[in-house]
């Protein structure tokens, strides 16, 4: 029986035209057969959102040896569901999201369409990784990230990941990466999130903006600190959001 190369399903939330996904494809191609299903336009901040009020459609853009590329009208999570159920003839060996223009460290993970991709893969029992870089520029430089992307993806293909566990990988905005840190998710919140954007007869328009406030800025174990100090931050992330430590106390309330 012929051994098949690993099947790697790729998506992003910045859209099919983003540089980050092109670079990700380039980094991953030596590792297996690549199928890309990415949004046809930017879908940043969509989290795990699904399209439920209208049909979703896709279009084949490219079919080459070892690489097939589609675009989709839906969300990043739609992309994974659609590819898994309508396009692929076998279960992927790996789902990869990114490379996102902008980091997904700390509480950003809850808003991230990149991590929505990863969570969807994880829920389907597929080892999944999200890659992001601390640079929002359309022309961001991903060269320093490349070797780490390949190494991390290769290790996950070889070793797998525990059930309901995925990897959130963030790169600092530097060409002189100091190394890798295995991190916890930084605790924090966003402040001053809305900036007025007045229109001619209506001032009720706002841009989402803001500043991230790290609740533990000196905590060298968290991802926010690692990125600020030039390290790749890898955070093992679980999909099960049950607060097990609170269950017994909640039972004692006798609700």
UniProtKB/Swiss-Prot annotation:
Positions of a divalent metal cation binding: 13-14, 44, 100
Catalytic activity: a ribonucleoside 5'-phosphate + H2O = a ribonucleoside + phosphate
Enzymatic class: hydrolase
Entry keyword set: Cytoplasm, Hydrolase, Metal-binding, Nucleotide-binding
Needed co-factor(s): a divalent metal cation
Record text on cofactor binding: Binds 1 divalent metal cation per subunit.
UniProt keyword Nucleotide-binding, yes or no: yes
GO MF annotation: an example: 3'-nucleotidase activity
UniProt-listed Enzyme Commission number(s): 3.1.3.5
GO cellular component, one term: cytoplasm
Any coiled-coil regions, as ranges: none
Record localization: Cytoplasm
Family: Belongs to the SurE nucleotidase family.
Function field: Nucleotidase that shows phosphatase activity on nucleoside 5'-monophosphates.
HAMAP family: SurE (MF_00060)
Name of the protein in question: 5'-nucleotidase SurE
Organism listed in the record: Bacteroides fragilis (strain ATCC 25285 / DSM 2151 / CCUG 4856 / JCM 11019 / LMG 10263 / NCTC 9343 / Onslow / VPI 2553 / EN-2)
Record lineage: Bacteria, Pseudomonadati, Bacteroidota, Bacteroidia, Bacteroidales
Gene that specifies this protein: surE
């Amino acid at each position: 029986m012929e051994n098949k190369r690993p099947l790697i399903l790729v998506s992003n939330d910045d859209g099919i035209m983003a540089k980050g996904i092109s670079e990700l494809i380039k980094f991953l191609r030596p590792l297996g057969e690549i199928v890309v299903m990415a949004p046809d336009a930017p879908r940043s901040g969509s989290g795990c959102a699904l399209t439920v009020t209208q049909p979703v459609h896709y279009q084949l853009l490219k079919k080459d040896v070892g690489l097939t590329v589609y675009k989709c009208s839906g969300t990043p999570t739609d992309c994974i569901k659609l590819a898994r159920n309508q396009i692929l003839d076998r279960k992927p060996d790996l789902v990869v999201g990114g490379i996102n223009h902008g980091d997904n460290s700390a509480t950003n993970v809850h808003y991230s369409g990149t991590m929505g991709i990863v969570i969807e893969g994880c829920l389907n029992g597929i080892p999944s990784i999200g890659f992001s870089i601390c640079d929002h520029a359309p022309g961001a430089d991903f060269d320093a990230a490349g070797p780490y992307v390949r190494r991390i993806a290769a290790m996950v293909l070889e070793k797998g990941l525990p059930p309901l566990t995925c990897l959130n990988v963030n790169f600092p905005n530097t060409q002189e990466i100091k190394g890798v840190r295995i991190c916890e998710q930084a605790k924090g919140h966003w402040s001053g999130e809305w900036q007025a954007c007045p229109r001619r007869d209506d001032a009720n328009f706002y841009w989402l903006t803001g500043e991230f406030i790290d609740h533990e800025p000196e905590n060298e174990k968290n991802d926010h600190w690692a990125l600020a100090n030039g390290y790749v931050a890898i955070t093992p992330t679980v999909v099960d959001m049950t607060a097990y430590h609170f269950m017994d106390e909640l039972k004692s309330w006798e609700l």
